[in-house]
A protein has these predicted regions:
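Surface-exposed loop and turn segments in beta-propeller and other repeat-based domains
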Residues: 1-15, 45-107, 143-165, 197-242, ...
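Repetitive beta-architecture junctions, highlighting loop-to-beta-strand starts
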Residues: 132-134, 147, 188, 264, ...
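Conserved beta-propeller blade signature
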Residues: 28-33, 121-125, 179-183, 254-258, ...
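Short loop/turn segments immediately following the C-termini of beta-strands
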Residues: 25, 34-37, 44, 127-129, ...
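Structural signature of eukaryotic scaffold interfaces centered on beta-propeller domains
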Residues: 19-27, 88, 92-96, 100-119, ...
């Protein structure tokens, strides 16, 4: 959509589109998730200059270097398109002499969140199969031929302690230092992942559960499920998350925030102290949050010139507070430096 001309232009793509995120690069690259068969992007600068939608877009398959030779080569191990075969926790039936492609036609096992990384890579989240995955994608010099992926699963040992499990990554974002954050909608954590702590990045053992030391799981506040006291399961549901890189809210830079989707709240984690700040929308207003972003409209106006915005939406708003006729809304949050600040 062009605000100046008030015209919409439809751009055909050869890949699925779902979540979208602009990269901070010279091409204003727009990355789109929706599949693991092909993770795609649009060079918006080139498209604006030429109107050539075919040459302005590109895509990569997600293929992991499981033979450890440092490059991706064909033929590779192809996934069972039901999604049950590839790179799940436990035994992985792959030919170790080949690389391995990740993929599924099951909509719940496709790529979900997407975020460009400061090092030039792109990360996507995959919710299923349990425990879910984060996938790091490098384009190389000549994509799609040079695309290479890495896969990382939250800590999940079916034979181990359920309190240590993490599962269900949905949202994904990154701070200015390159630390990746994801909301684990299944286990109820806001989790960070630091790839620099990994000893193994590729090879036959790099199938997901090979870098537990890179993960830090922060259990979100809130009630537990009855009968689930011995597990990590939280009764809250975290649809997505976001990192406040530029102090738009007022809690500082690089503060990760998860949606408390079923607790009428946003959950901000202060990374230095691991303190939770809960931003609650009071009952009976209702607040089924599914995403958020920040705006600094006037850097010189103090707290009044900045804030974050979150969507209040679901497919069945009639079941929320307000009943039939309840509409989706946008909610703005601002934090005063002290209660009397004007």
């Amino acid at each position: 959509y062009d605000p100046e001309t008030e015209k919409f232009v439809l751009i055909d793509t050869c890949f699925f589109t779902h979540h979208l995120q602009f990269a901070d690069d010279e091409n204003d690259t727009l990355w789109l998730s929706g599949s693991t068969e092909a993770v795609g992007w649009l060079n918006t600068r080139l498209y604006d200059e030429t109107g050539d939608e075919r040459n302005a877009q590109g895509w990569c398959p997600t293929v992991v270097d499981t033979n450890g030779d440092g490059v991706i080569t064909k033929p590779w191990n192809e996934p069972d398109m039901s999604g049950d075969f590839v790179l799940t926790a436990g035994d992985v039936a792959i030919d170790p002499a080949l690389d391995t492609r990740i993929g599924s036609l099951d909509k719940f096992q496709r790529a979900y969140g997407v975020i460009p990384h400061p090092d030039g890579s792109v990360w996507i989240s995959r919710r299923y199969p349990v425990p879910g995955q984060l996938i790091r994608l490098e384009l190389g010099d000549n994509p799609p031929e040079t695309c290479k992926s890495e896969v990382y699963e939250p800590p999940y040992d079916p034979a181990g302690d359920p309190k240590a499990w993490g599962y269900g990554p949905r949202g994904i974002d990154v701070d200015r230092n390159g630390l990746v954050w994801t909301a684990l909608g299944g286990s109820g954590h806001l989790a960070s992942f630091d790839r620099s702590k990994c000893n193994v990045l590729n090879g036959p053992t790099a199938t997901g559960q090979h870098c537990e030391q890179g993960w830090t799981l922060h259990q979100t506040p809130g009630p537990r499920f009855k009968g689930a006291e011995g597990t990590s399961a939280n009764a809250d549901y975290h649809y997505y998350n976001w990192v406040d890189q530029f102090n738009a809210l007022g809690l500082g830079e690089n503060v990760p925030i998860a949606t408390g989707t079923t607790s009428d709240a946003l959950l901000a984690l202060l990374p230095d102290t691991e303190e939770w700040i809960v931003l609650r929308v009071p009952y009976p207003l209702g607040f089924y949050s599914r995403g958020l972003d920040g705006r600094i409209d006037d850097p010189g106006a103090g707290w009044k010139g900045r804030g974050i915005w979150s969507s209040f939406n679901t497919g069945s708003t009639q079941h929320l507070e307000g009943g039939k006729g309840t509409a989706s809304e946008l909610v703005r949050f601002q934090i005063r430096p002290d209660p009397l600040a004007n």
